Amino acid sequence: VACNPHRVGFLGLLVTLGIVFGDIGTSPLYVMKAILHTGETISESTILGALSCIIWTLTLQTTIKYVCVALRADNNGEGGILALYALLRKMKRKWIYILAIIGASTLLADGIITPAITVTTAIEGLESISPHLPVIPITLAIITIIFFVQRFGTESIGKSFGVFMLIWFLLLGVTGAFSITSYPLILKAFNPYYAAMLLARSPEWFLILGAVFLCTTGAEALYSDLGHCGRKNIAISWGFVKTMLILNYLGQGAWVLNHADTALAVNPFFAIMPQSMLFFAIIMATGAAIVASQALISGTFSILSEAMNLHFWPRMRIKHPTHVKGQLYIPMINLAMYIGVVLIILLFRDSSHMEAAYGLAITITMLMTTLLLGFYLHSKGVARIFTMLFMGAYCTIEAIFLTANLSKFLAGGWCTMLIGGILFLMMYVWVRAMKIRRHYISTKPLNDYYQIISDIKADESIPKYASNLVYVNHASKEGTVDDKLLYSIINKQPKRADHYWLINMEFVDTPDTLEYSCETLIPDTLYSVTMHIGFRIEPRVSLYLRQVVEDLVASRKVDLKSTYPSLRKNGIPGDFRFIIIHRVYYPERSDNRQQNLLMSIYAIISKIGIDEPKALGLDTSMVVVERVPLIISQRTGSIRRIARIEE
């Protein structure tokens, strides 16, 4: 369901609850349980210290960093680490893209573990009712349904997410507040003194912080979903959500101190529920886990869609299952995520083991966001002292959390780091390979060929290839053209047409830009159309060109009626044919081993993408693909004639 990011009202706040807070809203299911399993002795000082860490982590990380600072670093209303990078990519620091792809890779890796841990923890609540219920099969069944329905879109059920999450957060707050009454001294946890004392005296402080960090793993989603809901809706909703979360954490802490002897045997989240409400709480927890999973899956699709337009990821088939703006479905990614989540569940078996795999990857994402935010603040002329204080404080905090989470590496953190590492390698190779490809594309000044193109059009001895011939021009410099494009028109097979169209695509730093400019290079013959496409917009060239042509015809800047008398008599327009110059990389030995390795990996990665006509949204019945070799070897040589010996 859509949310107007520019308006604040009850409906907008309700929708925001359903879209933004699923991940962070399910953290109470496992955070306290994870803290109890660090091995630290259960005592008042331990629980007060841990709760104080939770409260101040939510305050420093989520409230101050994300709500107060990051939400203001928007790219025309859009947020997220890639939207932030798009604002900065014109900076002189060319290496800054590495921060963006590290952050995006680890964020995507986190999206694999979140559905697994949230759904598993919710279903484990059934063990308190019936200890012999098969948790894993039920969890796998729910996960299968979640991923299966993605192809149909979630517009119909999405409308209820906001109402559901409102009930969920009220359940968290009310049950937590009721439990607090049994141990009112738990409110001392608001004093950061207890957090400092716990971390100072406990030899297991890094394990405790690793568990505490799980309370804020969903904070990055607040920033990523900025474009869906708007800063004010998120900020106001967060005030309510944070209150409910803290009440629940305090309630769980109160229960633990009242039941210190048995606390390790059960999940405190379900333990604070009245027995009569336990089954209802399990149903609600399962529903909240589904909402959180849905948000992560949708977020993954959005991130990869942005990555494609930023040339971080190969083009893949994207579907739009509903009419809701921004709702995407990428079949191959959906399948890959499903397989990944299932393997995580089968590998770790229960939520306690999954907790070890959770948190490490997202810590790195947050650290990368902090660094990019620092560059953003500097680019906006924010006082240097404030920028340095912000970066220093949050780099220190997140480095401490990273150190704490590294302690979980062997116990399970390796899993998300492996996934994140593979994704980073793919993105890094793709970026470098695209730069290499552009480097070896030879271009020529277009105006040197105006006369010969005009002559080809006028030469009736050449069979007409099409009425309108369209090329995608990959030359980056204005006024130049890909030499293989000229070779296609002039040398390979002279192509006579009534009109030649050169399409230049410029992916801009703003998210939703969709504009064009058209220049007539040869009157009534050659046109150059530049499409300015935002990083959230799909490059559907056929559709956009049709709109461009309709505009030009309506303004009488071009006459596209067929030149065939019988067709022109009936007002039928000329046909269009697209020519795609596809460069195929052929591995060759060269002295640059690093470049050879990059291009070899690139050739493998490119197999998961779709071909260029589909990537550009072209009608394949109107497309001719001309393949040419991409030669990156610097070696040159000449063939030597062998002397012929006459007998």
Regions found by a protein language model. Give the residues of each.
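The structured alpha-helical core of multi-pass membrane proteins
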Residues: 1-647
